[in-house]
């Protein structure tokens, strides 16, 4: 069992789980794993949270002591960093400092290979082994210690790429953006404006402490209020590192990742561009989307929660579209990771091309009611037997009714997540999920 890497890199509460000492040891372990890194380049970027500088300094110390040069791109989205790592010459790795949608108390470290993909599980496990060993790894002589370069200018390369994909303009459209005080606070409004849209941007003045704070993709109902006051034709709300997006139709309907997947799948299929007539979702993907896809002769492949697992299935089957309910959408013809900005631009491109409103594209996708709860398990070792008991409790409460359930330990937070879904009133699902939560809490109180 891995101690540090979860489903999305290393993540935890800053100065408790994720310390500068750990960040330094990680970069030294990477030096140890890759061996001769003298003169190699690593791109480092971050979201806007205040702990970024502390963690970046620690990482830089480890890399430069091994002779690596650091290209500091500053505040950037995770997908933009992934793209730049792949498209910048002589780069060995990319490192993103971010805890994505989590509150400011958290931060994380994600590592990308120079092909733009996150590290494989087995490589992460090997790096953990190096991290746990005594640091006897290469240290450069004083004349060969690495240096830091300000490379914030290469973000323009990513912006240019997005404009090439859209290959048009959005003149006549008014767009609302909730940037969650995160990585897209500057670049998202810039790109939409450069493409001719009128932009109303909220939550862009970050201060290091307000990322994801009652805003962004984690709080769509709050964003919806901003949208309804904006007078915009369409709205998009992002998370802290810009790898997910939730949209709003012209009447304020929340368009989540499942509905966006349905819209994108139909568009690509109509164009003859949907590879394999299949898309990838997760165990959380709504049954309503699956029914819709069947009606347009598209197969849904389900996998574990996490965009890395969605990507694994895309690669396995040679597909080009996948995503999660939360708004991680992978348009694999263009990007190797979820990209909130690309997804929002692509949706607006479809609207303009078809000359319709977003509600018209979404109306045939009936999303079944779904409710979520979570139970804190911080400090507890959740065994397989305990997880089985959680499922038994859930089945006892559901009592044979036609309701789909998911009970799983989170890969990014110390919580157990409970999801119920069915073609029944949401109020009824809420009653059931709260009963399940209460029984699981009672069970955990004995440990």
Swiss-Prot record:
Q: Name one GO molecular function term.
A: phosphomannomutase activity
This protein's GO CC annotations: cytosol
Q: Which residues does Mg(2+) bind?
A: 100, 239, 241, 243
Q: Which reaction does it catalyse?
A: alpha-D-glucosamine 1-phosphate = D-glucosamine 6-phosphate
Cite the Gene3D superfamilies for this sequence.
Answer: Alpha-D-Glucose-1,6-Bisphosphate, subunit A, domain 3, Alpha-D-phosphohexomutase, C-terminal domain
UniProt entry tagged with the keyword Magnesium = yes
Name the residues annotated as catalytic in the UniProt entry.
100 (phosphoserine intermediate)
Q: How is it modified after translation?
A: Activated by phosphorylation.
One short Pfam family name for this protein? PGM_PMM_III
- Sites where Phosphoserine occurs are at 100
Q: Does the keyword Isomerase apply?
A: yes
The record's listing under InterPro entries reads: A-D-PHexomutase_a/b/a-I, A-D-PHexomutase_a/b/a-I/II/III, A-D-PHexomutase_a/b/a-II, A-D-PHexomutase_a/b/a-III, A-D-PHexomutase_C, A-D-PHexomutase_C_sf, A-D-PHexomutase_CS, Alpha-D-phosphohexomutase_SF
Instruction: Write out the GO biological process terms.
Output: carbohydrate metabolic process; peptidoglycan biosynthetic process; UDP-N-acetylglucosamine biosynthetic process
Q: What is its EC number?
A: 5.4.2.10
What enzyme category does the UniProt record give? isomerase
Question: What cofactor does this one take?
Answer: Mg(2+)
Keywords in alphabetical order:
Isomerase, Magnesium, Metal-binding, Phosphoprotein
What is the recorded function of this protein according to its Swiss-Prot or TrEMBL entry? Catalyzes the conversion of glucosamine-6-phosphate to glucosamine-1-phosphate.
Q: What is the name attached to this protein's record? A: Phosphoglucosamine mutase
Which organism does this record belong to?
Dictyoglomus turgidum (strain DSM 6724 / Z-1310)
Give the gene that encodes this protein.
glmM
């Amino acid at each position: 069992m891995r101690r540090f890497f979860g489903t999305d890199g290393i993540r935890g509460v800053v100065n408790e789980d994720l310390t500068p000492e750990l960040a330094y040891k990680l970069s030294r372990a990477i030096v140890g794993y890759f061996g001769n890194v003298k003169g190699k380049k690593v791109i480092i970027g971050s979201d806007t949270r205040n702990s970024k500088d502390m963690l970046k300094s620690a990482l830089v110390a480890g890399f430069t002591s091994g002779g690596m040069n650091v290209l500091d791109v500053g505040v950037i989205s995770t997908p933009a960093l992934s793209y730049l790592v792949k498209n910048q010459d002589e780069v060995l790795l990319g490192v993103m400092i971010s805890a994505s949608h989590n509150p400011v108390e958290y931060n994380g470290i994600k590592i990308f290979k120079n092909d733009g993909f996150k590290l494989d599980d087995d490589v992460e496990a090997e790096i953990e082994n190096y991290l746990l060993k005594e640091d006897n790894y290469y240290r450069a002589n004083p004349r060969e210690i690495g240096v830091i370069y300000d490379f914030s200018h290469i973000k323009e390369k990513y912006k240019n790429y997005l404009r090439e994909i859209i290959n048009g303009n959005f003149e006549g459209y008014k767009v609302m953006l909730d940037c969650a005080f995160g990585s897209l606070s500057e670049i998202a409004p810039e790109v939409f404006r450069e493409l001719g849209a009128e932009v109303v941007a909220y939550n862009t003045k970050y201060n290091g402490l307000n990322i994801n704070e009652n805003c962004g993709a984690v709080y769509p109902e709050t964003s919806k209020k901003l949208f309804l006051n904006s007078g915009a034709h369409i709205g998009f709300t992002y998370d802290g590192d810009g790898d997910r997006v939730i949209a709003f139709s012209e009447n304020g309907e929340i368009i989540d990742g499942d509905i966006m997947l349905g819209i994108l799948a139909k568009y690509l299929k109509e164009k003859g561009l949907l590879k394999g007539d299949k898309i990838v979702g997760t165990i959380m993907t709504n049954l309503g989307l699956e029914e819709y896809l069947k009606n347009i002769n598209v197969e849904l492949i389900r996998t574990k929660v996490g965009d890395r697992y969605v990507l694994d299935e895309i690669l396995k089957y040679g597909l080009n579209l996948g995503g999660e309910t939360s708004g991680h959408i992978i348009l694999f013809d263009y990007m190797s990771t979820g990209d909130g900005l690309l997804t929002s631009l692509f949706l607006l491109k479809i609207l303009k091309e078809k000359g319709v409103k977003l509600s018209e594209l979404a109306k045939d996708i009936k999303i079944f009611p779904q409710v979520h709860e979570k139970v804190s398990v911080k400090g507890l070792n959740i065994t397989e037997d305990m997880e089985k008991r959680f499922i038994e409790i859930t089945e006892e409460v559901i009592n044979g009714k036609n309701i789909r359930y998911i009970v799983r330990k989170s890969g990014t937070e110390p919580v157990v997540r409970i999801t119920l879904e069915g073609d029944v009133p949401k109020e009824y699902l809420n009653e059931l999920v709260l009963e399940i939560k209460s029984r699981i809490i009672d069970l955990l109180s004995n440990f």
